[in-house]
Amino acid sequence: MVLLPGSMLLTSNLHHLRHQMSPGSWKRLIILLSCVFGGGGTSLQNKNPHQPMTLTWQVLSQTGDVVWDTKAVQPPWTWWPTLKPDVCALAASLESWDIPGTDVSSSKRVRPPDSDYTAAYKQITWGAIGCSYPRARTRMASSTFYVCPRDGRTLSEARRCGGLESLYCKEWDCETTGTGYWLSKSSKDLITVKWDQNSEWTQKFQQCHQTGWCNPLKIDFTDKGKLSKDWITGKTWGLRFYVSGHPGVQFTIRLKITNMPAVAVGPDLVLVEQGPPRTSLALPPPLPPREAPPPSLPDSNSTALATSAQTPTVRKTIVTLNTPPPTTGDRLFDLVQGAFLTLNATNPGATESCWLCLAMGPPYYEAIASSGEVAYSTDLDRCRWGTQGKLTLTEVSGHGLCIGKVPFTHQHLCNQTLSINSSGDHQYLLPSNHSWWACSTGLTPCLSTSVFNQTRDFCIQVQLIPRIYYYPEEVLLQAYDNSHPRTKREAVSLTLAVLLGLGITAGIGTGSTALIKGPIDLQQGLTSLQIAIDADLRALQDSVSKLEDSLTSLSEVVLQNRRGLDLLFLKEGGLCAALKEECCFYIDHSGAVRDSMKKLKEKLDKRQLERQKSQNWYEGWFNNSPWFTTLLSTIAGPLLLLLLLLILGPCIINKLVQFINDRISAVKILVLRQKYQALENEGNL
């Protein structure tokens, strides 16, 4: 078994810490857990790096208003568009410019009302740049500018280049990009800033006169900028024009990452297929048809700012109702039911009468390396993105398909290594049917070719199997049979992964191939098991995400206790039977039984009746009266000793009396003989 690294670290057993914690420590722990569970949403670090999300690049002015943005659905840190904010939109509401009364909303209009020339002449001199009338905007387009960064500077550079009062360009050599002739083409900054259009002065004047704002910038990300992960907090620059007075503006670039956009509410054909909650996992519901995204249409009322921005791809999402999440009992029972369907398709004889048990502590899943065929796709809907990543598999076995730079400690899991074609358009690498990618960054249903780094990361295609233990029917009956006391042997358990491998082929390594290409019953069982696995992984990931910012040891303890509480509720509710630290469900050919404790009681009663029929009349005394056995074993010794004394006592006493009388008679005879011998001697004299 191999531990596949991930962001969620598994720690050793921490039960000894519980006995060392005082009541005050428990109070602090409860407060900490309340803060963790009641905190905000999941951070970006908890997300699957291959999962597409809504990325919004924003350009903010000095006033903090968003003057330009663009959106797309892509994996994080893979989409680097060209940003095109207008200079006059950045200068709106600034007292240092000639449009202090123009807010951001008016700057986004098709043709904002120009200030009257009388007021404009008071603010700027003839021949100066500005935003209040067409000629001033046109002169701006032909001017040179330079850009200085605020972030990423050392203390000495910050003192030398100044702050907002100088737009971070207090001295020369602080600028990093721009249109100046003295600037190098290769920028050492995170971005490069140029003019978006290079038209002649006359054409520029006509364009500025017709469309209002006409000075969009062209901001591109450098290779250094694409490696930075600090765009979420935003980075700020100062832009100054190489003209008299060096006027300028400040702008901030920020990335906003959110989940997939919510679907609209309305009539849809998929609603017809929805019914009451399913009572069986025999077949999954049919997938709704996917619709191609409609082409984006230009808006006749769009501004020059809007037309210069990149139009994001619009995707039509299938409407679904917000169904409540499954309860703990339904989720765990569906997991057992899916395991039964898969096991019944591979080894029907094993499911005639048995118990399938869920363990309280991790690991909850084990993986078998798979060698199924993979496919490339640009359709992100083909991936099961509902399940987050960042989960670690502690037990991976078998031989399967690997990609990336596999370390020496994991090469025995690979019988084939695949190279990813990362060039070209962005694509997703889909695993074979019912498979996952177990990567060094965590568990993921799909791989993004733009995110995956072949020189650093590695992934193994695996078949996920829940850690479910198999016991024959007699094991639970013996564990709960208190009417027949005897020394019980330790129960021998088999995991579901071992049973699937033994039921299909002779080994787990080759058995994984049969899991991919099996009969129709097996495919249906695997589909049902996959649905249950997805629901359970989502619940586990939610627990990990809420606790990720806390101590790793605390996360593991709470996560283990959380599954233990789930199983405890099932056991106390009579839905499963407890065997050591496992929650067991009764299985027969009809499937998993929800009321397993009731089924166990029926089995025990039936076994008791059969045993009573085969017993003699005196054997029933010991079964009907347990105290009689204890009383008899207590007084049996003294009774046997008393009986022996009564039987053998008279004989022993008689023998002893006879022996004493014999000895007394012998003594008397000796005394008489001595007297008679003396008289005889006297007569002879």
UniProtKB/Swiss-Prot annotation:
A motif (YXXL motif) lies at residues 676-679. Keywords: Cleavage on pair of basic residues, Coiled coil, Disulfide bond, Fusion of virus membrane with host cell membrane, Fusion of virus membrane with host membrane, Glycoprotein, Host cell membrane, Host membrane, Host-virus interaction, Lipoprotein, Membrane, Palmitate, Signal, Transmembrane, Transmembrane helix, Viral attachment to host cell, Viral envelope protein, Viral penetration into host cytoplasm, Virion, Virus entry into host cell. It comes from the Viruses. InterPro entries: FMuLV_rcpt-bd, TLV/ENV_coat_polyprotein. The 17 amino acids long immunosuppressive region is present in many retroviral envelope proteins. Synthetic peptides derived from this relatively conserved sequence inhibit immune function in vitro and in vivo. The YXXL motif is involved in determining the exact site of viral release at the surface of infected mononuclear cells and promotes endocytosis. Residues 283-297 have a biased composition (Pro residues). Residues 520-570, 580-616 form a coiled coil. The mature envelope protein (Env) consists of a trimer of SU-TM heterodimers attached by a labile interchain disulfide bond. It comes from Gibbon ape leukemia virus. The record marks 489-490, 669-670 as: Cleavage. Residues 299-309 have a biased composition (Polar residues). GO terms for biological process: fusion of virus membrane with host plasma membrane; symbiont entry into host cell; virion attachment to host cell. A motif (CXXC) lies at residues 354-357. SUPFAM superfamilies: ENV polyprotein, receptor-binding domain, Virus ectodomain. A motif (CX6CC) lies at residues 576-584. Residues 42-632 are extracellular. The chain crosses the membrane at residues 633-653. Specific enzymatic cleavages in vivo yield mature proteins. Envelope glycoproteins are synthesized as an inactive precursor that is N-glycosylated and processed likely by host cell furin or by a furin-like protease in the Golgi to yield the mature SU and TM proteins. The cleavage site between SU and TM requires the minimal sequence [KR]-X-[KR]-R. The R-peptide is released from the C-terminus of the cytoplasmic tail of the TM protein upon particle formation as a result of proteolytic cleavage by the viral protease. Cleavage of this peptide is required for TM to become fusogenic. The gene is env. Disulfide bonds join 148-169, 161-174, 354-357, 354-584, 576-583. This is Envelope glycoprotein. The lineage of its organism: Viruses, Riboviria, Pararnavirae, Artverviricota, Revtraviricetes. Residues 1-41 form the signal peptide. PANTHER family: ENVELOPE GLYCOPROTEIN-RELATED, VIRAL ENVELOPE PROTEIN. The surface protein (SU) attaches the virus to the host cell by binding to its receptor. This interaction triggers the refolding of the transmembrane protein (TM) and is thought to activate its fusogenic potential by unmasking its fusion peptide. Fusion occurs at the host cell plasma membrane. The keyword Hydrolase does not apply. Residues 654-685 are cytoplasmic. Residues 559-575 are annotated as: Immunosuppression.
